[in-house]
C-alpha cells in the first residue's frame, strides 16, 4: 500500500513539474462560431448540426450573428417524408431522423426563422421532446399509407399530421419582426444569413460503388 501511495506522489510531482503554462500560446486565427445547441430528446440532429454550420458559415462570410431555429424545418420535412411514405404504401423510410442535404434543401425552399421568434417549445414545456411526436406520426403514416386513403384524400392526412406537429411544436410564422424589421422566412434568409444552397456540395462514398468517382 505504501509503495502504491509513493508511486502516486511521484506521478503527481512529475505532472506538476512538467505542466505547461497557456501563456506561451498565442491565438493566430480565431474562428467565430455561435453558441452550442441542444436537441435534447429529439431526433433532429440533422437540423441542429446543419444550421450550426450555416450560422458559422454566415459569420465567415461577414454576416452578423444569427441563431436559426432548427425546429422550423421539422414540419415541412415530416410532411415530405409522409408524402413519400404514403405514395409507396408504407414501403419507405419514416421517422424523425434525416440527413444534412434535407436540411440544406429545406433552407433553400423555406428560408429561415430566428430561434428567438420560433423555437418549437410549447408553453409549459422546457425542452425538445419528440418521442411522442415520432410515435404518433409513424402510427398515422402506417395507417394512412397501407389503407390507400392517403392517395385518395391527400388534404385530410396532411391536415392531420400538421395538427399533431402544431400541438407539440407549434406553428411557425409566415411573417415576423426581427430587430425592428419585418421579414418572411425567405427574406430573412436572404438578408440576414446570405447562404446560397448551390455553393455547397455533399461528398460521401459507398462500398458498393467505385471510390473517387463523381
Region roles according to the model:
Residues 1-21:
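Bacterial Sec-dependent N-terminal signal peptides
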Residues 20-214:
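Catalytic-core signature of thiol
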Amino acid at each position: 500500500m505504501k509503495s502504491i501511495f509513493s508511486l502516486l506522489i511521484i506521478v503527481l510531482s512529475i505532472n506538476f513539474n512538467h505542466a505547461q503554462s497557456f501563456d506561451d500560446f498565442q491565438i493566430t486565427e480565431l474562428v467565430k462560431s455561435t453558441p452550442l445547441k441542444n436537441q435534447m430528446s429529439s431526433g433532429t440532429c440533422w437540423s441542429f448540426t446543419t444550421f450550426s454550420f450555416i450560422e458559422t458559415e454566415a459569420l465567415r462570410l461577414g454576416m452578423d450573428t444569427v441563431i436559426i431555429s432548427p425546429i422550423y424545418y421539422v414540419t415541412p420535412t415530416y410532411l415530405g417524408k409522409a408524402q413519400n411514405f404514403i405514395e409507396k404504401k408504407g414501403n419507405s423510410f419514416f421517422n424523425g431522423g434525416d440527413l444534412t442535404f434535407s436540411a440544406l434543401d429545406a433552407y433553400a425552399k423555406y428560408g429561415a426563422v430566428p430561434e428567438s421568434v420560433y423555437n418549437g417549445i410549447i408553453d409549459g414545456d422546457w425542452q425538445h421532446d419528440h418521442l411522442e411526436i415520432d410515435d404518433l406520426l409513424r402510427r398515422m403514416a402506417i395507417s394512412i399509407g397501407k389503407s390507400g386513403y392517403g392517395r385518395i384524400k391527400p388534404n385530410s392526412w396532411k391536415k392531420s399530421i400538421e395538427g399533431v406537429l402544431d400541438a407539440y411544436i407549434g406553428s411557425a410564422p409566415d411573417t415576423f419582426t426581427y430587430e425592428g424589421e419585418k421579414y418572411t422566412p425567405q427574406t430573412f434568409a436572404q438578408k440576414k444569413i446570405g447562404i446560397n444552397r448551390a455553393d455547397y456540395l455533399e461528398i460521401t462514398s459507398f462500398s458498393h460503388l467505385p471510390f473517387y468517382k463523381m
